[in-house]
Each structure stands twice: as C-alpha cells, then as structure tokens.
C-alpha cells in the first residue's frame, strides 16, 4: 500500500543521514522525505551515519573528504528527490549526485551553449542537468549563432544538418558531458565526434580475435552509458604482453552479442515515430529504449577485467564508446494493444518487453549487488500466453533452482575473471538467446556443453554457485548444433518448430525457453554438444509432448534471425529464412563465443513466475516514474480501448463495482441477481489483462483521458442469460444502483463524506428495493430522527429525516445558490444498468441515484431535483412514472416556458419547464446517454452523468427533458414502466414525510421541507432559487439520441468525441451521420464549461527548470491542486499549464489545442500568498501580436480556451488526418498527443491508407522532400485529399489568423482551404457531450 505521494513506506530503510549546508526550508523538505521513507536523522555528521547529504558544498570540502575517506556515501539533495520519485534508492555514485568541485562550474564553461537531438524522455532532462552542473547554458532550439555544442544520438535530422553546415558548432555524444564532469575540465571534442548510434554499431560488430575467443566478457546490462544512474562499471581492459593496443574485430567476444543485436535497429530510413500505424493491416509498433539501460561507467564501481594467459589492453576510448548501449528512436516498437512496452518492471530487474497477441518475449536484466561486488544477470524469456512476466535471477522456478548463475561474487577490485582451467564457466547470462539451426556450418555450430559452474572467482569473495544437478543430467551424447543468435528489439522469435511438431503444442506449451550455455576449456575447435538422456531430462522438466519429441530428435532448433512482432507467431516450420535488414550487422560466431546451450521448457501452467515488487533502479530515460506509467495514453488506435489498471471500474458479465475516489471505504456488492461465478471469472480476466498495468501513476488513476474513462466506465456487457429465470417484465422492472452499498434489511446506512444509501428487502413479497446515492455535498436517506452534517468545501448541509409513509411521499425542495458559487457545475459519472443490475461509477466525485421498481409495491423514492410520481395499477400490471420539474421563484421578472416533445422509436415524452430569463441558465444541459439497442449507456469526461437502461422490448422511449427531467416509457404486455433518474449536484434529498433539510451554499441558506401527500404515488416540486448572475446552473441535462446506430454518446467537459464499446450488435453509421443525429434542446444554446472551484480538481502541468517545477508543484499540492506526472510530455488530464515563458513546445502546443488554461508563474506565487488557488484569468498568457521568435500568436491561448468554454471541444475537434513519411518536427509522438488533446484523430501513420481515401479525411501530413510522383501522394491527390506539412497544424493552433498556404504541398491549396473551412465551422459548433 502506497501513500498518496506514491512513496513506498521503507524507501530509505537503513539510511542514516546527516544534512549539511541546506537552508531550513529545503532541509526540512528533504528530512521529511527521508524520515517518512524509513531513514534515520543522526543530526550532525558522525561515524554512525551512512549518507552525508550536502548542498552548496564543494567536492573537496573537508567534511566531504572526511566522509569519503571513512566510506560514507556523499551525495547532493537531488539523490533524495530522485529516489523519492522512483520509490527506491538511486545509484549514489551517479555523476549527477556528486558535489561540485567549483560552484561556478568548470572553467571556461560559461561560454558553452549546448543543444541536443535524438534523445528522449528523461535522457533529455539529465543531459540538461549535466550542462547545468558544468556551468553552461542549455538551449532547446538550435540557434545557429549561439549554440556551441550539439549532443547527437544520430547524425540526422534538421538540427544535425544545420549544425553540420556551421563549423563553430561541435558535434559530440553525451559521454563528453560525463567525462568533462568527472575530470572537471573541458575535454577535446575530437574524441567524442561519433554518434551514439555509430557506437552501437561498433559495439555490436566488435569481436575479439580467435586467440581471445574463450575470454567471456561481462557487459553490465541495464545501466547508462552516461554513467548517471544505475551501478556504474568502467571500460573493460585486457592486458596483453607487450602492452600493444589492438582494435576490436568482428567475431570478438568482448562485446555482448545478444544484447547489442537485440537492440539493433532494423531500418534507418524512418524514425521510430513513423513506424506506428493504426491501420489493421499494418499494425506496426514501436518502443523507446533509453541508451542508458545497458552500459554505465563510474570509477567508483571498479573495473571489469578479463584475464587470459597473458594480458591484453584495449584502447580505452574505443571500448568506452563501444560500451554505449543501443538507443534508437527509430526501431523499437510498442504494441498498441497494451501500450506497456518499453516500461521497466517495478523491481531491480528492469525488463524491456515486447508484446504481441501471440508469442511474447521478455528480457529481464538483473543486477544483484553484494559487499564483494556486483554481477549482472540476464535471462531471455519467451512467452505465448498473453501475459507479461519477468524472470528474476534470484527467483527461478523450483523446476530449475540452479539457474541462478551468479550470486554477487564479482569483486569491484578484481571484477569478473574467466580462467583457462579444467572447470568451465558460464558466460554472462546476457548472451542467452534462442538460436537458429545452421547445419551448413557444423564446425561453427556444434559446441560441447559441460557442467555449469559459477563463472566468477573473486579474490575477495570467491564463492561458487553449486553445480547444477539438473544440468548434469541434461548433458548427454546427443548433438546439439547451434549458431549465434541475433536479436533485434522489434523482432520476436518465430518459426521455431519443425513441420512435424504441431503448431499448437509449441505455441501453447513452449512458454519459456532459457538457453543456458557454457564454454568448455580446451580447444575451441571442439564443437560437439552432448546432452545425456534427454528423455529423462524432459520428463523431469515436465516437458510437453512436442518439446519432448524435440529433445528426443537429438537436435534443438534455434533461430537467429527474428521476425517482427506482427509476424511473431510460431508457425511450426523453419521453411523460410526471415530477411535481414541492411543495418543488421552480420555476426560471425567464434567457436567458443557465448550463446549455445540447452533449452529449458516449462509447461503452460507454470508461466506465472514469482517476482519481487520493487521499483526499478533509475537510469537515464527511466527516471521519475513512481510506477509503470502508461505512455501515450492518447492512443490513436481507434479500434482498441485505452488500457487501465482500475479493475473496479470495469463491469462485465455480472461484475458490479463502483469506485469513488476520495473515499477509503469503498465497497463492492454483487446483487443476488448476478452470477457469482461470472463475477469471479471476470475478476480473473481483469487480473490477467491488467497484470502489466499495476503501477499506473496515481494522478492518472484518478483522472484518465476522457476517451479512456469512457472505455473504462462503460465496458458493460449485457448478461441476459444470467438473470436466473427472471421474466422480461421482472428484468425490466428492476434497476439496481450500487455505490458504497451493502445488503440491508430495512437498515439505513449513512456515509457523510460520499453519501448514504438505503436498501430494503421485502421478505414477504420477495421484492427488493435498492437505492444508492452519492452527492458531492451531501446525501441523506434515513429513518425517523436520523440526521447528520457534512461539510464539503464551504458548503454545509444538514438534513433531518422525520417520518415517512410507505405509499405517500411528497417532497418540496428549495435550493438557493450563490452567484459566485459554481458548485453545481460539476457532473459525475453515473452508470445504471437496468437489465442485469450492474452499476459502475467512476471519477473523482461520483453521484449516483436510482431506484428499484417492484411489481406490487407502490412506493418508491427517487433522488433527483424533482421527486418522481409513481402510479402502480397492480390489477392491470401497469406501471407509470412521471416527472415534472418546475423551477419558480426566479429572481427575475420574466419567465420563459418551453415544451419539448419528441418521438423516438414510437415513444412520447412531455416535459414542461419554467426557466430563468437567462438563457444559459437553463439552456445548456448535461448529456444523458441511453443506448436502446445494446443496453449500453456511456459518459465521457471526468465528471458527467450517465444513466444506463437496457430495454428488453422493441418499444423504447427516450425523451429530452431539457430541464433536468427524463421520462422513459415502454409498454410490454400491459406492463408499462416509466423511470426517471436525476441527480442533484449539490444536495440530494429523498426523505420521509415531514423531513426537513437545511443547506448552506456559500452564504445562502436553503430550507427544505417535505410535506405529506395524498394518493399512492410521489409528487415533487423542486424550487431552485438562483442569483440572476449565477452561472452555476448553466449545465443541465441534454439527451443525444442516435437512432441510426442505436447508440447515444454522452461526453464530458474534456472530450467532445464519445467512443463506446458496445456489447451487442448495433447499427453503426459514419461520424458525420452521428453528428447530424444529435438532438439539441435549443439550437441557440451555447455550452459554457465552468470549473467547479470547490469540487472539480484542477490538474496542473508545469514547465521550466526542474528546481522551479518542483517548487511550484509543492505549492500547488499544498493548495489542494493536483499535479500531473512530471515530464516534458503533455498529460491529457491537465487543465492548467504553468509556463515561465511562451515557447513552441509540446506542452504549449497540446495545451493550446486542448483549450487549457495557459498561465504565468505569477499565478502560483500569488496563490501561495493568498493561501488558495486564485481565479485564472488575470494570469493568463494573452497579448496581441507575436512572440519574440515569431512562432506564436499571443492571442492563441485565450482564443482556444474560449472555444472550449463555448463549445466544449478543442481546437482540432473532428479533424481526421493521416501521416505519411517521417515526422521530425514535431515528432510523431508529440503530434499524436497534441492532436488527441485538441480532439482530433490521426487515422493512420503508415501505409496502407486505402481505408481512409475518402472525403472524411481532412488532411494528409507529408514529410518534407516527399516526391510528388510517390504512389501514395498520387492516391491522395486523386481523392482530393490536401497534402500539407505538419507545420500546417502547428501554426493553425499556435498562430491562428496567419496564412498557412506556405505549408500546403503539390498545389492542393483549394482542397486545403475547403478542409480549413470545415475546421472553422467545427470550431463554432456547439457540441453536447
């Protein structure tokens, strides 16, 4: 269980710290984090402390020198903050946490202006931090006359091309920064004029000569080439008689073949952003891999040595470069199904996962450390069960306990040694890979496999892992020909079986293949692998039949060339050799290089491996994620719902759940009409589906993107077969609402914080009524004399229930709202499923109301603005419910009356409303969605009202109660059922005769009195008194019914496009048809979106330097605001963007497109002084003219915010585009997030585009330099789709009002103007979500 801050309880366990040099405020902040995480404050620096944490002290300060000499850890305060962020102790040896040698920076660094290109994620932030530590300046844009150094990962892109033409700009890789900081001087750039990508290729192709072929190298996995985060190990040096330097050759075993090749880019002609496609035919995926995950070097960690009979020395510069891990934005791919790829597991084993619906591969890198040193382990797992799992080196399954190769016996001083003796040793597990059978070269492919022992013989702690008994049994006389494996990040093993092996047996049972390889001492020419008694070994391993036959055949097939994920299903044949990319280095395996060995297979049932739940060690590119965040929540995959880890939000097949955030006493009720077995099955299903999503950021949990919440809350499956012998009438007559609900027999339950509910069971008639209500301010349903008081914000509500008659209820309520109080603006998520009694309620503040209609009971309670009138004629079996809402006593001399009458599918509704003269106060209503065909009703947005009802009969009535009343009527064999469900935002009252309630909202007080009533039904009059200038009631209810598709979309404030998952088959129409089918209360209505100052959370995203961001985030949290995950990427839940200056960044682009508040930093400072979050408008970035660089029209932030307030949608609402070619500025990921934030849609990012060659596609975004005669360009032109550059959209958002013609390609200006006009019309379109 984690705290609200996301910090595990014992992050700093064992840390005895002393703080030196801090100011009181900063020191107290760090001390609080340390103590809360289990650290112990020892006060002054003494020998008892383990960590000396300093600020503004130099590296050579006497206290720092004394601490280092005594073996203490000396770090800066950043180490505490970063460890706090990731939930575990960060690497204290990182250069980022080392005290400076001079507070003024490295001599001569003041003139440095550094820019970067090719790095992503937290790599960028750490490079910026290193520049800051050096004393230089960092510039995000490459300003030709200012920038002095460009840090390149790859020598490509616009920045590189510009820098190459300007001789004064030095092109270096990031290791230059690191080495400068280590040596505290500016080093010559000539040694670093090689890109990170070229270093990758160099290392991947580096092989030792045949003389050193038996020397196995240990390349530290999962570490950073920048030497910043995870345990650092310097370059490997091998001494050779004569001391001559020799170059790395192809075939050398010094470098880790498998890791390098596994990350080798497949192609270089397109960036990785362009490899994402939503097209079903080209489900290309991408994954971002940080270069920091593989090699990290710091002198403190010691030196990895490899000793041969002699001693050999490698050129340190080459080796240093070659240790750089592969880091490519262009190749690694992410699965759109789960979007969990590339995220580290929450453990010391950080794994890079590739997910496909078929085979899954997981490469886990283990770093285990002991006092004697640290060792690196890596295992390769291949899974096909649709689950993502990790295999920890310490936690191999019982079936193979000896698979723990090393146990921390690598000495930091002596490091890893491989000796030429009679006892063979295992190469590092990082070389374990499935391999391909190559019978054409038996001399290279056949290798002896001997007993497995510990490869390390450390002088300090030279203990050995026990020799595996199982592996001894596995050694036999059978020949196992193998060849080296090449693996790429975008490729998964495929075609691993032979024709005679059934496909099913391999794909279902060969769930894990761990290739254990061991070298045999002696001649490298000896290439026969013997495996004894494979049948017995297979029996002990509980192998599947096909796997046993595979072993019995005497040959284990391996495959080196790997298939892409979309093709990575085991086809049961090795009948084709996958084509190799030009950039895949062709490796020749030396006779004793790592890679061969035995396959261990497990049965299907044993794929669940125990793993430790710990946060990953930090590395560049991975820092700052407390858990596994969902990257790119704004998935462009239209056919796939966004992932979530909120299992309690999903309702399927009898599962009833209702999360109400902010309330710890959440309860989950399964109604008796539900099938408990189905509930269990669904729970298991959800567990499986969300296994990789357990650690989503807490802010993301609470407020996901609107489209995502739409899928989460509304994944409702109609379960008619499970209604257990209920007649259609009974099924239709019973509606269950479950929020914080328990089964009670005439016993009321009160919950002052989130509401109360009462459940009644009539045992005599076997009828059940269930009512649930959750109100933002209060909700009371109770027995005689029960009362409570609840405070929400400044509102205080006291309600008293006095008495009640079973069949007679009359309610008369009056509600007064202050003009300055917007408490009635927020809407909540509410879902009612009529057919099988399921309810899901999601969101920060859920408001749920409903009732159970029984067949013979005439009394009911209805929590609503207006109580409902229920008349039951038991003789005729008719049931009718009518609702009338009357708003009177308006503080204005004129009254507007409106009657709305519509026919939908043969249903009539009459609604009479008296309204305020202020049109807005009664015109704009909230969407209520009714899915008549599939029983699915959905709501978009963090706060919205959803009423779901499944009608079993053909006749269904959906009526537009434009003033907060909805009436549904249907006739089923003389059984008429009317239902009204209305929710009152500020207070909900459903009480008994004579009950009274006093509500105070702001300074206004309201007296509610319940009076008796004649007859057997309920009659209600709800009187609402409002200030004339009050905007709090401007959001009411609006019903949009799409009869063509039997689907009604209801959207919240954050998203205009509602996409729902329909359980039953339903007719679907085009988007234009759906839009044209929307019904509006008033064609003149203009939607106004107001944030509820008291109740609706504000989500802030901050820009600027890290220290400033951290400070602002702390202030915002103290003022009860919420902060989005700290990242340079846009977060969809953000409502406010705090920017110290306006620049054309992703955050600004997405914030403007979404219509969010873009505020100056003064807003935070003044809010801090005021002790509360102030009104935003005085602090909004808004002016006339352009910004200093001419990239932004200063009127754009306010323009698009007003568009959202007026219409409810973003700047790109309804936009449908395809992307063709490379997207560099902005990158594709940025473009996707911004377009999604602006409520647009990217249809596809790679060919084929056949499905989208129609008039509904507004633009085709083309990469610069694409020739006109390209086949797809011709297709776009033939279908009159305008072709534009990506800057067209950027400037449309950032520079509204300025000409865009210069960004139009191939003379498609007339078509572009037509699409532009469509966007302008949509901008004025009032959309009701």
UniProtKB/Swiss-Prot annotation:
Pfam families cross-referenced by the UniProt entry: BRCT, PTCB-BRCT
SMART domains: BRCT
UniProt cross-references to InterPro entries, sorted A to Z: At4g02110-like (IPR044254), BRCT_dom (IPR001357), BRCT_dom_sf (IPR036420)
Domain named BRCT: residues: 7-97, 104-194, 1090-1181
Basic and acidic residues bias locations: 410-422, 600-611, 818-827, 971-983, 1024-1047
Ranges annotated as biased composition (Basic residues): 793-802
Low complexity: compositionally biased ranges: 986-1004
Bias type Polar residues, positions: 323-335, 363-378
Parts of the chain that traverse the membrane: none
Keywords assigned by UniProt, alphabetized: Repeat
Region Disordered: start-end pairs: 295-378, 393-470, 576-645, 745-827, 952-1077
PANTHER family the UniProt entry points to: BRCA1 C TERMINUS DOMAIN CONTAINING PROTEIN, EXPRESSED (PTHR47181:SF2)
Protein name, UniProt field: BRCT domain-containing protein At4g02110
């Amino acid at each position: 269980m984690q705290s609200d801050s996301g910090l595990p309880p014992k992050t700093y366990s064992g840390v005895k710290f002393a703080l030196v040099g801090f100011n009181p405020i900063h020191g107290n902040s760090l001390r609080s984090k340390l103590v809360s995480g289990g650290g112990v404050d020892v006060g002054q620096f003494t020998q008892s402390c383990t960590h000396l944490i300093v600020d503004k002290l130099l590296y050579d300060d006497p206290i720092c020198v004394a601490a280092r000499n005594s073996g203490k850890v000396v770090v800066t305060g950043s180490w505490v903050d970063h460890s706090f962020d990731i939930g575990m102790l960060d690497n204290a040896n990182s250069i980022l946490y080392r005290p400076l040698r001079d507070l003024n920076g490295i001599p001569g660094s003041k003139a440095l202006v550094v820019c970067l290109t090719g790095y992503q994620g937290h790599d960028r932030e750490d490079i910026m931090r290193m520049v800051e530590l050096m004393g230089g300046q960092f510039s995000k844009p490459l300003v030709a006359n200012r920038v002095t150094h460009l840090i390149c990962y790859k020598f490509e892109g616009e920045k590189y091309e510009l820098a190459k033409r300007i001789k004064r700009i030095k092109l270096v890789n990031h290791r230059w920064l690191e080495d400068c900081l280590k040596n505290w001087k500016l080093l010559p750039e000539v040694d670093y004029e090689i890109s990170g990508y070229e270093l990758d290729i160099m290392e991947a192709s580096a092989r030792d000569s045949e003389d050193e072929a038996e020397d196995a190298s240990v390349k530290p996995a999962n570490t950073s080439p920048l030497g910043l985060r995870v345990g650092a190990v310097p370059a490997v040096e091998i001494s050779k008689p004569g001391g001559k330097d020799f170059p790395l050759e192809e075939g050398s075993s010094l470098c880790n073949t498998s890791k390098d090749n596994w990350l080798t880019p497949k192609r270089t002609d397109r960036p990785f952003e362009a490899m994402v496609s939503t097209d079903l035919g080209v489900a290309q995926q991408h994954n971002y891999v940080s270069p920091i995950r593989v090699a990290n070097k710091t002198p403190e960690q010691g030196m990895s040595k490899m000793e041969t009979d002699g001693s050999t020395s490698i050129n340190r510069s080459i080796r240093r470069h070659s240790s750089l891990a592969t880091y490519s934005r262009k190749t690694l791919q992410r699965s759109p199904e789960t979007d969990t790829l590339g995220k580290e597991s929450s453990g010391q084993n950080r794994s890079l996962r590739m997910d496909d619906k078929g085979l899954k591969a997981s490469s886990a890198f283990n770093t285990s450390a002991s006092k004697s040193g640290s060792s690196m382990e890596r295992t390769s797992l291949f899974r096909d069960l649709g689950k993502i799992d990790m295999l920890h080196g310490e936690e191999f399954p019982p079936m193979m306990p000896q698979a723990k190769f090393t146990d921390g016996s690598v000495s930091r001083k002596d490091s890893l040694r491989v000796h030429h003796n009679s006892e063979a040793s295992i190469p590092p597990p990082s070389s374990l890979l499935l391999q391909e059978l190559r019978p054409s070269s038996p001399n290279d492919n056949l290798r002896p496999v001997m007993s497995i022992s510990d490869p390390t013989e450390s002088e300090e702690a030279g203990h050995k892992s026990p020799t595996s008994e199982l592996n001894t049994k596995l050694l036999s006389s059978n020949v196992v020909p193998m060849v080296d494996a090449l693996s790429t990040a975008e490729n998964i093993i495929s075609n691993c079986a032979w024709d005679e092996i059934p496909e099913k047996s391999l794909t279902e049972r060969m769930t894990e293949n761990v290739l254990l390889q061991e070298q045999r001492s002696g001649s490298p020419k000896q290439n026969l692998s013997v495996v004894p008694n494979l049948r017995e070994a297979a029996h002990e391993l509980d192998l599947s039949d096909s796997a046993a036959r595979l072993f019995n055949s005497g040959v284990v097939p391996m495959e080196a060339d790997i298939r892409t994920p979309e093709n990575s299903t085991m086809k049961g044949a090795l009948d084709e050799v996958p084509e190799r990319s030009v950039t895949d280095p062709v490796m020749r395996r030396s006779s004793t290089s790592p890679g061969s060995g035995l396959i261990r297979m497990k049965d299907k049932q044993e794929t669940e491996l125990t793993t430790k739940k710990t946060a990953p060690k930090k590395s560049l590119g991975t820092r700052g994620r407390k858990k596994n965040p969902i990257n790119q929540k704004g998935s462009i995959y239209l056919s796939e719902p966004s992932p979530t880890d909120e299992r309690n939000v999903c309702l399927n097949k009898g599962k009833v759940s209702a999360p109400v955030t902010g309330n710890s006493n959440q309860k989950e009720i399964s109604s008796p009409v539900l099938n408990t077995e189905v509930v269990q099955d669904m729970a298991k299903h959800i567990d499986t589906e969300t296994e990789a999503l357990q650690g989503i950021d807490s802010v993301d949990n609470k407020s996901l993107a609107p489209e995502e919440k739409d899928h989460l809350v509304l994944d409702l499956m109609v379960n008619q077969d499970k209604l257990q012998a209920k007649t259609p009438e009974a099924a239709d007559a019973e509606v269950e609402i479950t929020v914080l609900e328990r089964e009670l027999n005439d016993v009321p339950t009160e919950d002052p914080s989130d509401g109360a509910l009462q459940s009644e069971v009539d045992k005599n008639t076997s009828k059940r009524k269930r009512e649930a209500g959750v109100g933002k301010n209060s909700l009371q349903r109770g027995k005689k004399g029960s009362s409570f008081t609840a405070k929400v914000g400044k509102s205080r509500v006291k309600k008293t229930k006095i008495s009640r008659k079973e069949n007679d209820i009359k309610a008369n309520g009056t509600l007064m709202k202050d003009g300055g109080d917007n408490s009635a603006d927020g809407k909540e998520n509410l879902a009612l499923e009529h057919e099988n009694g399921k309810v899901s309620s999601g969101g920060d503040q859920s408001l749920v109301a409903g009732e159970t209609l029984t067949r013979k009971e005439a009394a009911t309670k209805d929590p609503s603005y207006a109580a409902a009138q229920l008349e039951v004629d038991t003789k005729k079996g008719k049931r009718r419910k009518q609702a009338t809402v009357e708003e009177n006593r308006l503080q204005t001399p004129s009254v507007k009356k409106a009657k709305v009458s519509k026919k939908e599918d043969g249903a009539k509704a009459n609604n009479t409303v008296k309204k305020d003269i202020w049109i807005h106060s009664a015109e704009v209503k909230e969407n209520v969605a009714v899915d008549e065909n599939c029983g699915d009703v959905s709501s978009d947005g963090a706060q919205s009202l959803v009423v779901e009802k499944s009608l079993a009969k053909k006749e269904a009535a959906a009526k537009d109660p434009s003033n907060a009343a909805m009436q549904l009527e249907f006739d089923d064999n003389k059984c008429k059922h009317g239902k009204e469900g209305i929710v009152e935002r500020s207070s909900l009252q459903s009480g008994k005769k004579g009950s009274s309630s006093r509500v105070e909202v702001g300074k206004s007080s309201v007296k509610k009195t319940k009076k008796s009533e004649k007859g057997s039904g309920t009659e209600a009059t709800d009187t609402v008194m409002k200030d004339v200038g009050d905007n709090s009631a401007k959001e009411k209810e609006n019903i949009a019914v799409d009869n063509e598709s039997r689907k009604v979309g209801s959207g919240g404030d954050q998203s205009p496009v509602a996409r729902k998952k329909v359980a039953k088959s339903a007719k679907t129409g085009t988007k234009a048809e759906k839009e044209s089918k929307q019904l509006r209360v008033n064609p003149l209505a203009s939607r106004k979106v107001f944030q509820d100052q008291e109740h609706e959370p504000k989500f802030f995203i901050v820009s600027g330097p890290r220290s400033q961001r951290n400070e602002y985030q702390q202030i915002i949290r103290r003022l009860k605001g919420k902060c989005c995950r700290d990242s340079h990427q846009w977060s969809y839940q953000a409502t406010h963007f705090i920017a110290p200056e306006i620049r054309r960044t992703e955050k600004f682009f997405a914030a403007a497109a979404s219509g969010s508040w873009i505020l100056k930093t003064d807003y935070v400072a003044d809010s801090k002084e005021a002790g509360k979050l102030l009104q935003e408008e005085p602090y909004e970035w808004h002016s006339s003219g352009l910004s200093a660089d001419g990239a932004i029209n200063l009127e754009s932030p306010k323009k698009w915010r007003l568009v959202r307030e007026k219409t409810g949608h973003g700047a790109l609402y309804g936009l449908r585009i395809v992307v063709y070619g490379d997207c560099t500025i902005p990158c594709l990921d940025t473009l996707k997030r911004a377009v999604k934030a602006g409520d647009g849609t990217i249809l596809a990012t790679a060919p084929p585009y056949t499905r989208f060659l129609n008039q509904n596609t507004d633009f085709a975004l083309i990469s610069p330099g694409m020739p006109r005669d390209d086949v797809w360009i011709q297709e776009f032109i033939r279908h009159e789709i305008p072709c534009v550059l990506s800057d067209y959209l950027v400037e449309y958002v950032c520079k509204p009002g300025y000409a865009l013609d210069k960004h139009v390609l191939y003379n498609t200006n007339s078509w572009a103007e037509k699409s532009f006009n469509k966007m302008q019309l949509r901008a004025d379109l009032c959309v009701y979500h």
